[in-house]
């Protein structure tokens, strides 16, 4: 992202009508940063659509807003869910979702392993959530960090800190180096004349293998400063070197704290919606889950105490709805072979009092609600209420 035309500073090529640069920026190759450019990875999250739909449903049901606009949805978000206003220490949210092990599309907690870790660790804060999601990755899991972390959380008196500075920086993660920023802060606070810039450089150097001679020399220089600073602060040389070894060890899977907290904020927001607007969240969850996971999603909804009402030509809509606090109504869109035109025709012309009313209704356009559509409705048992004993 720059303030002037890209073609002035880098080569551009056309690929399928889209302008692209052949330059790369990633773990292995960095061609943009040396030239002073910043690359932004902008990723979409299906969870944000679920949140948007949930807020839309909340506005419709609880605030009498018939057709919420994007501005209406954003206003609700800003007043209720924005990080600056939401209560991040709501015990009900942690108790109802993360501690109780109840999951329904909760961001970052859709896998059983993450759910199990959260239930064992009993998170009580955003930092706790951030630590759990940072640990739940292949590197930390293979090293058994999850088990050691849970033990430390449940038995805090067993955690030993080298000194007050170490405790101050690692207390929030029960003595574990989980975030990359913790390594940088410890180097800065414990080392002798290690600037924040050098501490941040160390964070980067520790994650790289096969350093060139200049970078290796810089790393060793920081090591000597770190050990010297620790000794001045009453930490033995051996303890300082052991701590450095922890830096080396944990840097292999340390996670960026700002990234972890930002993602955990979304996890908490989804948990808040699931706690206080459960039916609206459940409907949005079922709407957004792909067909390949729909059956599992319905079972999750049932485990939350919901009854799934059968498909009904007169009451089912275009998306999942809740008829009351304990009943969810499946939409017509879940019927295989029933197209959008047929669904639109049904919703516009209903209610239908009987099969005859449906078949011989002069207002129904036959080419929209055709034989194929009627067959699909029958197979899905969506017309049971229209049947009498003759059928």
Give the label of every model feature segment:
Residues 1-391:
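Noncatalytic, beta-rich nucleic-acid-contacting surfaces in large DNA/RNA-processing enzymes
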């Amino acid at each position: 992202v720059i303030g002037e035309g890209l073609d002035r500073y880098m080569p551009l090529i056309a690929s399928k009508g889209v302008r692209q640069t052949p330059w790369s920026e990633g773990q292995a190759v960095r061609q943009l940063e040396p030239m002073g450019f910043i690359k932004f990875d902008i990723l979409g999250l299906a969870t944000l659509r679920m949140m948007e739909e949930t807020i839309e449903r909340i506005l419709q049901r609880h605030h009498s807003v018939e057709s919420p606009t994007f501005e209406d949805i954003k206003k609700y978000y800003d007043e209720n869910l924005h990080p600056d206003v939401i209560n991040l220490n709501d015990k009900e949210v942690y108790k109802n979702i993360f501690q109780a092990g109840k999951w329904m599309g909760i961001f970052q907690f859709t896998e059983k392993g993450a759910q199990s870790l959260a239930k064992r660790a009993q998170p009580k804060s955003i930092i706790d959530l951030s630590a759990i999601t940072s640990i739940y990755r292949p590197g930390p899991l293979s090293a058994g960090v999850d088990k050691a972390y849970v033990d430390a959380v449940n038995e805090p008196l067993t955690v030993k800190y080298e000194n007050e500075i170490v405790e101050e920086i690692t207390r929030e993660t029960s003595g574990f180096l989980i975030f990359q920023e913790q390594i940088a802060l410890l180097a800065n606070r414990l080392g002798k004349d290690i600037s924040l810039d050098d501490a941040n450089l160390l964070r980067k150097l520790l994650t790289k293998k096969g350093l060139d001679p200049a970078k290796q020399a810089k790393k060793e220089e920081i090591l000597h400063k770190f050990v010297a600073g620790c000794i001045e602060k009453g930490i033995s040389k051996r303890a300082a070197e052991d701590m450095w070894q922890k830096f080396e060890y944990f840097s292999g899977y340390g996670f960026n704290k700002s990234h972890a907290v930002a993602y955990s904020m979304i996890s908490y927001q989804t948990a808040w919606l699931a706690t206080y607007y459960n039916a609206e969240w459940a409907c949005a969850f079922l709407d957004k889950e792909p067909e390949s996971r729909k059956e599992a999603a319905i079972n999750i909804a049932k485990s939350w105490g919901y009854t799934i009402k059968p498909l009904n030509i007169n009451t089912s809509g275009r998306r999942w709805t809740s008829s009351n606090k304990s009943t969810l109504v499946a939409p017509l869109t879940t019927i295989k072979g029933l197209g959008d035109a047929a669904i639109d025709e049904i919703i516009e012309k209903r209610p239908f009092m009987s099969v005859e009313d449906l078949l011989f209704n002069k207002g129904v356009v036959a080419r929209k609600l055709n034989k194929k559509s009627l067959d699909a409705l029958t197979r899905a048992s969506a017309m049971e209420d229209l049947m009498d004993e003759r059928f």
